[in-house]
Amino acid sequence: MSSVLRNQDNPPTISEVSSTTKENTDNSNSKQEEKEKEKEISSTIENPTFVDDEEDNNPFSHHGEGLTSFMTANSFNEGPNTKSDKRTTKENNNSSSNNNRGDNNDDDDDDSLLLYNTSNNNKSNNVSRVNPMLKSTGEVFKTVNMNFESRVTKLLKPNTKIRIQITEAGNSNEGMSNSSKKYTVYTIKLINLEDPNNDILTRRRYSDFESLRDVLTKIFPLIVIPPIPPKNYFDFSMLNGLVGSNHENSSLSVAGSNGNSGGSGGGGASGGAGSGSGNGSIITSPKTYSYINSTHLTKGKLIEHRKRLLTNFLNNCLEIKQIRSLEFFAKFLDPNANWGDEIALIQSQLPKSIYLSNPENGLKTDPIYSNLPNPSNKNTISFFKDNKKKLTKKTNKLLSNGSENHDIGVGGGGGSIGNGGNGVNGNGTNSQSQYIANTSMLDDINKRIMENYIGLSNDYSKLGSTFNSFSLILAETTTTTTTGVSSATKKSNDNELNLIFDKIGQVFDRSYITINSLIGELETKFSEPLGEIVQYTSIIHYVAKYQSKKIKQKSMLDNEIKDKRKTLEDLLKIERESNRIENAINSQVKPKNGKYNLEQQQSSTVSPAPPPGPPPSSSSSSSSSSKFKFPSFKKITQYVSEIIDQNPEVTRKQKITNLQEKIQILEKCQNIMLADLSFITDEVNKNIQSFQKRQLKMIYKILLLYNKQLIGWAKKNIDIWEEVRDEIAKM
């Protein structure tokens, strides 16, 4: 009986089960119940993996033991008793070991599908019985390494030969609240030259290109970032009569109007650019070149023009290794990336001003750069301070000599104002800028030549139609006159003249076709590259302007350190004086001072008491307070106490410590500025030298193309006229 009770509390072993079956042979009911229990236990042992997996997959196992964990714990503890009545002890041991191996294999297979290992499942179950909160400590999590590399990043590796092409430009209303409004989307094709089938297509708007270039100029202010075509195509020539001069030459000269005003305007523009230092006008804003301001171009031609220049922009960015290795540049070419989110993230990481960032890479800016002074905030004030004497002299000369206004404006005054307004160092930047060709003058000349070609093509079309109408009129007159007059010679002469007019009309028609083809070739092969050179020139001047601003920032930092040190010396001097006075007061010995204080206190205590009646002043004050209402005295004292320093010694010491810390930070900034300026000088000189070589090569190349196109056009015209001459001679 005791063995039966023990079996109810703890799981029985194989020997105990055999002994109990021998002792209780007469009790058949208890034997049948035990057999049913053993069958249930054997069924749970044969398929324990489902329950075990359910327990292992429970992510909240530390919250307590559930029914499944209780069943699995009992099943594993009662597992060896499954077949005790049918087999011997040795067979049961072998079968139990085999079953356990099978179960372990199932558990291993199931654990491979999980994010954490459950190999110590029995130990964790035993620990969970004591303290359920400790069960989660047995879980060993697997680390999932996502070594994912997109196709774009693979193609952008330095050793890969790739090329970018904008294949098409279509309209889209994706993301627009109003479906009727559409915008132009450009399809970018990233082509692997080694494997042409491995290409990637991406769709981007013009604003995406604009934001990309804007961020690149903020990250790399010293690198010449390739230009992009302007977005809006407007011709402001209608405003020239109202404004009086072009916005880029207005600060230098009144006589330098734009190129549309004939010969005098061209002379003024060239004079303004040649005399003095006309580089300041180029630094202010990038010039829109003549191709954009051509009014005869249609929207389709302008979109094709933009496709070509955006393709050049991306291919030129690929040639710059700093840009090619950027992660967000790969995101721009990745069709799966959301460019709006990427650009917002990058802009949040950049400083507000490029002068407060690392000139080598803005994304690697140290927080100490935020303590630098910003030279762009004090541009106008410093301009008037630095050029005060020059401005007064020039204004006096302008008022006294009205006839010499143009010479003074274009001469030395224009150069000084241009340099001072832009904060350009007269020695460094002008010596660098003299090696850069002024391509804006070439662009103005090209604009006038293209306008003349367009006018000539219109004249050719009118001449062709005129001569064709003459030939038709002459043919009608010959048919009417020959019926009345029988003159063979006159008829033949009229027919010859009719044919001559017809041939000359055909010549002008063919000349119209050839000159239009010339205009198209010059626009794509000469005006576009020339416009890029003009924009590159403004960009290189912008880089030179950045260098001059950094030099100005260095001088501002030196002045700030000088002022801080001066104020620190004054405060330290005041602190020494106060300490000396305090020490002198404390060092003096006053034996009579205590007696004097005691006598003074006694006199104050023995002072005569006031008369018992109410004082007259109280009644007067109460009456005055009843008549007039003044603000409370506590508010006034509080306001005064806020203005007046209550403890000047403590505040002075705090100022001294703050100034010392600030000076230490500024000295660190000074060391950083010295290193940055040396780096900036080297980079600017290197960029200007490389740009000078590139600029001369580009100009030489496009001039050769220009010469080739003109020679081909002239040969076609000669062939047309010689062909007509031979036909007329045969008559």
Swiss-Prot record:
A 1,2-diacyl-sn-glycero-3-phospho-(1D-myo-inositol-3-phosphate) binds at residues 205, 207, 231, 306. InterPro entries: AH/BAR_dom_sf (IPR027267), PX_dom (IPR001683), PX_dom_sf (IPR036871), Sorting_Nexin_Autophagy (IPR051079). One of its GO terms (cellular component) is phagophore assembly site membrane. The keyword Lipid metabolism does not apply. Residues 608-617 have a biased composition (Pro residues). It is a peripheral membrane protein. Required for cytoplasm to vacuole transport (Cvt), pexophagy and mitophagy. Also involved in endoplasmic reticulum-specific autophagic process and is essential for the survival of cells subjected to severe ER stress. Functions in protein retrieval from the endocytic pathway. Belongs to the sorting nexin family. This is Autophagy-related protein 20. It comes from Candida albicans (strain SC5314 / ATCC MYA-2876).
